[in-house]
């Protein structure tokens, strides 16, 4: 499926290939900084949820180039795809913004925990914690 987001980076941001966003990334526009800070860049993904391509809660979908790389570098990375991707997830509320393979390894642990221990109560807990993260935006890039 195609991940829909509000554009927060310059249109040529990935001209040299995909790369993780960094703190104070110069590719992010002024408007982009605001929409990332208030996390509204994710709002269009509700359409993907309504179409059944995503869930509100699940492992965050990743850029295809990163998926290919991480599949090779991280054992069990593909296992995170046994559940639908989500707008928010266990990794997002428990680990700060990741921008490296090592960060992806840590987030994978949370994604696998979620896939193995999914319950409606866990989804509710994640949604409540997501509201906290949106209201007090720590770690947005």
Q: What do the PLM-derived regions correspond to, one by one?
A:
Residues 1-141:
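Conserved small/aromatic sequence motifs within transmembrane helices
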């Amino acid at each position: 499926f195609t991940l829909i987001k509000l554009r927060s980076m310059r249109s040529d941001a990935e001209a040299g290939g995909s790369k993780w966003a960094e703190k104070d990334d110069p590719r992010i526009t002024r408007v982009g900084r605001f929409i990332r800070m208030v996390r509204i860049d994710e709002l269009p993904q509700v359409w993907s949820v309504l179409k059944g391509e995503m869930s509100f809660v699940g492992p965050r979908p990743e850029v295809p180039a990163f998926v290919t790389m991480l599949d090779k570098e991280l054992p069990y990375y593909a296992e995170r795809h046994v559940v639908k991707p989500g707008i928010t997830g266990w990794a997002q509320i428990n680990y700060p913004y990741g921008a490296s393979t090592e960060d992806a390894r840590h987030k994978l642990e949370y994604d696998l925990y979620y896939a193995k221990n999914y319950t409606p109560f866990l989804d509710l807990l994640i949604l409540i914690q997501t509201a906290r993260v949106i209201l007090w935006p720590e770690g947005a890039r």
